[in-house]
């Protein structure tokens, strides 16, 4: 939020933070204002606190936790219980930020009833403000059922990690003839009642066209600068762990991995050499 919006204030650290609860409707109202918003993933209380203090307005508890938290080889492996534990922790630390939670693979695809039950469980057990589900035309009926139940939905089209095997790997979506399908997916999720939509690994010009076409906000991840918001996995933007693979679309603003490793090594060395603890650390 801008300093002139009347809904943010400067903290002692100089960051602009929301002074009231950010609602999904608030972010929808930013559509077309030229004021993009930043979303980051978060998976625990302490990280959520840090991002709230930085003024991040919306956090995503993504099923990317399967990879970066639990060490699974695919997002399809994470369970509802695992997502619930992480999301509840993030909500407790998120301050005024809105929190969106991924519905895990296999919890919403089979039927409208299954989708509504999963979305309701996620919000009831965690306090999250919206759920995110992957897919366009093929999943529009599930989005409609969830929104008809009074639950906000963030859709996710383009590259959808839960469908990585069907898509043939980590590939850019929406090139050539695929642009028409992407636009059809975008229209379908909007018509089904989605409040916003993530565009992942989509050519920038295609994402710009989709953003212009839709009345709901688009959130880009590897989708160029013209989306209404941007999202990154925080491990990618902060280089954690050190030496890990970083997608081309992610910029690094810190080196958390190398700093943490260096701190752990220094601690180990001082303990081994008798340099810690000293008198100042004793009662």
Swiss-Prot record:
The active site is at 200 (proton acceptor). Homodecamer; pentamer of dimers. It comes from the Bacteria. It is an enzyme of class 2 (transferase). It comes from Corynebacterium jeikeium (strain K411). The lineage of its organism: Bacteria, Bacillati, Actinomycetota, Actinomycetes, Mycobacteriales. GO terms for molecular function: 3-methyl-2-oxobutanoate hydroxymethyltransferase activity; magnesium ion binding. Its main location: cytoplasm. Binds 1 Mg(2+) ion per subunit. 3-methyl-2-oxobutanoate binds at residues 63-64, 102, 132. Pathway: Cofactor biosynthesis; (R)-pantothenate biosynthesis; (R)-pantoate from 3-methyl-2-oxobutanoate: step 1/2. This is 3-methyl-2-oxobutanoate hydroxymethyltransferase. Keywords: Cytoplasm, Magnesium, Metal-binding, Pantothenate biosynthesis, Transferase.
């Amino acid at each position: 939020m801008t300093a002139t919006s009347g809904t943010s204030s400067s903290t002692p650290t100089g960051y602009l933070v929301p002074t009231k609860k950010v609602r999904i409707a608030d972010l929808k109202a930013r559509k077309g204002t030229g004021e993009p918003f930043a979303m980051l993933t978060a998976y625990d209380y302490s990280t959520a606190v840090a991002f709230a203090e930085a003024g991040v307005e919306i956090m995503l508890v993504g099923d990317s936790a399967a990879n970066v938290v639990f060490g699974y080889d695919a997002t399809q492996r994470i369970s509802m219980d695992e997502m619930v534990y992480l999301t509840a922790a993030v909500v407790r630390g998120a301050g005024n930020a809105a929190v969106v939670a991924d519905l895990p693979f296999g919890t919403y695809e089979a039927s409208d009833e299954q989708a509504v039950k999963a979305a309701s469980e996620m919000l009831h057990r965690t306090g999250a403000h919206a759920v995110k589900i992957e897919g366009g035309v093929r999943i529009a009926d599930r989005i409609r059922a969830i929104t008809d139940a009074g639950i906000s939905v963030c859709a996710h089209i383009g590259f959808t990690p839960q469908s990585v095997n069907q898509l043939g790997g980590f590939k850019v979506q929406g090139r050539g003839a695929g642009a028409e399908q992407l636009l059809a997916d975008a229209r379908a999720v909007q018509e089904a009642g989605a409040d916003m939509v993530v565009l992942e690994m989509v050519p920038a010009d295609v994402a710009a066209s989709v953003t212009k076409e839709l009345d709901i906000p688009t959130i880009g991840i590897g989708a160029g600068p013209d989306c209404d918001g941007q999202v990154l996995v925080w491990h990618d933007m902060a280089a954690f762990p050190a030496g890990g693979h970083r997608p081309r679309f992610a910029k690094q603003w810190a080196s958390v991995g190398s700093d943490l490793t260096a701190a752990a090594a220094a601690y180990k060395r001082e303990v081994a050499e008798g340099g810690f603890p000293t008198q100042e650390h004793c009662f």
